[in-house]
Structures are given as structure tokens and as C-alpha cells.
């Protein structure tokens, strides 16, 4: 679905954005605002306006945010939040220009959980269950934080707005600097009698069991989203989401690269030279593989569709079998004699076996 223009969505013109930029830049200019962090806020405002005023930059931000467009799946947490920069955009789009209702429903925070899974579980998928610590809305006060039978009172400092205005004299005239109310910490409410269960927090931590469907073909570092299993919402808002990142354990015999699996097949010299038909293990069971005569070490064979099912449903990967010809470390006298005969027939006679360096030097001096 094509994204609509920010200005069209919000009913704002570019002139109005420019006015908002001028207002915010004056409000947070380091020469005018001495509060900690004002200089960083000023830089973010300038950066945000630079993006909004350039159609190409705005289009890239719409699509990728601050993430590298070349990054792989699962590179970011939830593919989302842009931190303070997003707050600046909110200011341009009316969030900073108008008072936000601190009592309005807000979505809860997202959670992230790392889950270790076996090699085979990642390939074939699995239905399982995890238990995680997470905050839940307090059942005693139903999230208000107040003792049952009482209600939070409106903050008298900010009159429930959650923010207060501070007049600042500047060379441009008197300006109003808006900041979070320090009395109610931006909530707009004061809890005089706190709930004994949650101690005024409105939420309690519990251990919750959650069913998880591991998708077949998931790879190390990829993640899935479990909707509504994050932190509880605020003021009746929806719960956040749970992002599960998978850490896939290695395997003794197989190596995985994307949807393909690699296996090293060890062959004896006779098998490689004469050829053979052997059973090769795959994650789907054993299959027969014909080894042609004269196969060299490093030769590779493909077993079609014996790899991993693509997690997005785009077919199956393959298994690649790489040959490694093993050289015997210990030989009997009979085996040595046969190899010498083979070498003579091949015209490739090796140096005399069994002679030490001292014996070779001695024979040299004796003219032998």
C-alpha cells in the first residue's frame, strides 16, 4: 500500500510546517534555552525539518526510518521506534503544538525475548510454550494505582494537563517553554492513597505462559511478533507486542547458509578412485548418492530440495555434499606393498620408505 503524504494525512501545509519549525527552533535554541538537552533537541529539530522539507529524504524516511535499507530480516527491534527524532516529528505534526491529554489511552511498551531453539526446530518449526516475566494490569485497582474506593486527584500544579508552561524572556520577546510537570511526572494525576497491591504503579509483575509457534525455516537472528503480549496499555490503551528473537543452536554434522544445508562426506581413497553408491544423511532422512569413479577431494554434489523450507514460503533449499578424501594414517605392510605396486604401474614411484635422515646421509657419503 502506497503511503500518503504526511501533510495530506494531517491536513497541514508546508507553510504551517515551516512556522512550527521556526517556533520550535526558537524555543530550543541553545542561546535561549539553558535546560539540559536543549541543544540536542535543537539539532534534532533542524534535522527533522531538513527531512520534511525534502521530498526525496522524506520518502526514504517513510520507507526505512533510521534503519539501513540493506539490513537483513530481524536486524532491528520490531522494525520500529525512532526515539527522540520521532518525538520531533510529532511536534511538527501537532503533538508539540497542542497539549496532549495525559489521560488519553496509550499503547503499552513492546517487549523482546530471546529464545534458544535446536537446529531441527528451526528447520521444521514447532508449537511450544514460554514463560516470561511481564507486567500485568493490577487487578486490585484496575490500573488506576489508587486504593480501592478512592480515585486519583487532578494535579493542582498543571491542572491535569501533565505539562506546565514557563515564560522565558528572549531577544525575540517573551516565549513560553513547555515541559513535563514535575509534581505529577506528566500524568496529570496525584495518587494520595496508593493501592497496596501495586504500590501506586497500576501494574504488577507476573510470570506468564505464552504459546509460541516457531515458523518452519526460521534462521538465527530472525524474530516474530506476538501481538498484544507486551506491557499493558496506559489509561485503558491496548497492550504492546512481544518480539521473539531466535537463537539457533549449531549441529554436529550440518551447516546452514540461508535455506541451504552443507554436509562434508568423508571417502576412502578406493571409494573416490573406483566410485561407490553410499547413503548420505540429510535433515529429511538418508538418501543414496552415487559417487563417480575418479572423484576428487573438494568435489560437490547437490541434493535438490533436501535443504530448508523458506520461512516466507518461497520453495525449498538444497543440500550440498562436499567430498573429503581421507588419507590413511597407518598402513600394514601388505597395504604398503600394494600401494608401491600401484605407484610403479602409474609411473609415480615414491622415495624409499622407512629410511631415516641419518641413513640417507650415510648412504650419500658412501656413494650408494
Curated annotation (Swiss-Prot):
The cofactors it requires, by name, are: Zn(2+)
Origin, by domain of life? Bacteria
Start and end residues of the CXXCXGXG motif repeats are: 138-145, 155-162, 181-188, 195-202
Q: Report the InterPro entries cross-referenced here.
A: DnaJ (IPR012724), DnaJ_C (IPR002939), DnaJ_domain (IPR001623), DnaJ_domain_CS (IPR018253), HSP40/DnaJ_pept-bd (IPR008971), HSP_DnaJ_Cys-rich_dom (IPR001305), HSP_DnaJ_Cys-rich_dom_sf (IPR036410), J_dom_sf (IPR036869)
Name one molecular function that GO assigns to this entry.
Answer: ATP binding
Question: Which key words tag this protein in UniProt?
Answer: Chaperone, Cytoplasm, DNA replication, Metal-binding, Repeat, Stress response, Zinc, Zinc-finger
The UniProt note on the cofactor reads as follows: Binds 2 Zn(2+) ions per monomer.
UniProt keyword rRNA processing present: no
User: Which residues of this UniProt protein bind Zn(2+) 1?
Assistant: 138, 141, 195, 198
Q: What positions does the entry give for Zn(2+) 2 binding?
A: 155, 158, 181, 184
Keyword Metal-binding listed? The answer is yes
Q: Where are the zinc fingers (CR-type)?
A: 125-207
Q: Which residues form the J domain?
A: 5-65
GO cellular component terms attached to this protein's record: cytoplasm
Gene Ontology BP annotations: chaperone cofactor-dependent protein refolding; DNA replication; protein refolding; response to heat
Q: Where in the cell is it found?
A: Cytoplasm
Describe the protein's quaternary organization and the partners it interacts with. Homodimer.
Relay the domain remarks: The J domain is necessary and sufficient to stimulate DnaK ATPase activity. Zinc center 1 plays an important role in the autonomous, DnaK-independent chaperone activity of DnaJ. Zinc center 2 is essential for interaction with DnaK and for DnaJ activity.
Instruction: Show the PANTHER family listed in the entry.
Output: CHAPERONE PROTEIN DNAJ, DNAJ HOMOLOG 1, MITOCHONDRIAL-RELATED
What does the record give as the function of this protein? Participates actively in the response to hyperosmotic and heat shock by preventing the aggregation of stress-denatured proteins and by disaggregating proteins, also in an autonomous, DnaK-independent fashion. Unfolded proteins bind initially to DnaJ; upon interaction with the DnaJ-bound protein, DnaK hydrolyzes its bound ATP, resulting in the formation of a stable complex. GrpE releases ADP from DnaK; ATP binding to DnaK triggers the release of the substrate protein, thus completing the reaction cycle.
The similarity annotation says: Belongs to the DnaJ family.
| Name of protein | Chaperone protein DnaJ
Give the source species.
Lysinibacillus sphaericus (Bacillus sphaericus)
**Top-down, what is the taxonomic lineage of the species of origin?**
Bacteria, Bacillati, Bacillota, Bacilli, Bacillales
Gene that encodes the chain: dnaJ
